[in-house]
């Protein structure tokens, strides 16, 4: 009992906090999920991030958020960073990873989900709309309401293939 009391006193005196990272690495479970997001200022992205964070918290995970600011090089940087933290999964809402980034993901065998993005010839889970069907339904609705001149507005299409699907 005396030894335990001395240990507890030393913990209090030193304000010791165990390293959750070290504990997670030792156990092989970090309880971390990485989110690579294209633009953290986009209201859609904020809503997506909020929902993902709530789901992670409910399951006992901590969400690490990485904002790429729509820069491809940042996507690769954050991908490597999240892998070094040994996250247990990655959620990606990004501009579009290059082939070397995709190869790194496939080799890591990390569970991954794409949000509102599709990467050709890359097998993984995707959460998003059927963009072509949604655009068709919206256009048909406007035509049925008597509209004749219909304008499509979007952020720049860039390399985001789901935006092209909406045309």
Predicted features and spans:
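Central regulatory/effector-binding core of bacterial HTH transcription factors
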Residues: 54-103
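Short acidic/polar active-site loop segments enriched in Thr and Asp
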Residues: 31, 88, 147-150
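Interdomain hinge and pocket-entrance segments immediately C-terminal to HTH DNA-binding domains
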Residues: 18, 27-41, 59-61, 155
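N-terminal winged-helix
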Residues: 37-54
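Bacterial carbohydrate/catabolite-sensing allosteric modules
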Residues: 12-15, 51-62, 77, 83, ...
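Short histidine/acidic/glycine/proline-rich micro-motifs that form metal-
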Residues: 39-42, 69-70, 96, 143, ...
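N-terminal helix-turn-helix DNA-binding module of bacterial transcription factors
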Residues: 1-31
């Amino acid at each position: 009992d005396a030894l335990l009391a001395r240990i507890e006193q030393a913990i209090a005196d030193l304000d010791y906090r165990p390293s959750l990272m070290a504990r997670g690495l030792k156990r092989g479970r970090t309880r971390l999920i990485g989110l690579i997001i294209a633009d953290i200022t986009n209201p859609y992205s904020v809503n997506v991030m909020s929902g993902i964070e709530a789901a992670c918290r409910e399951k006992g995970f901590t969400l690490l958020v990485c904002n790429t600011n729509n820069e491809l090089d940042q996507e690769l940087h954050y991908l490597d960073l999240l892998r070094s933290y040994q996250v247990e999964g990655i959620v990606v809402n990004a501009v579009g990873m290059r082939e070397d980034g995709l190869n790194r993901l496939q080799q890591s065998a990390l569970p991954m989900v794409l949000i509102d993005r599709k990467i050709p010839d890359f097998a993984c889970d995707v959460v998003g709309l059927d963009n072509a069907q949604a655009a068709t339904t919206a256009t048909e609705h406007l035509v049925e309401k008597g509209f004749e001149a219909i304008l499509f507005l979007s952020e720049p299409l860039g390399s985001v293939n789901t935006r092209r699907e909406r045309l």
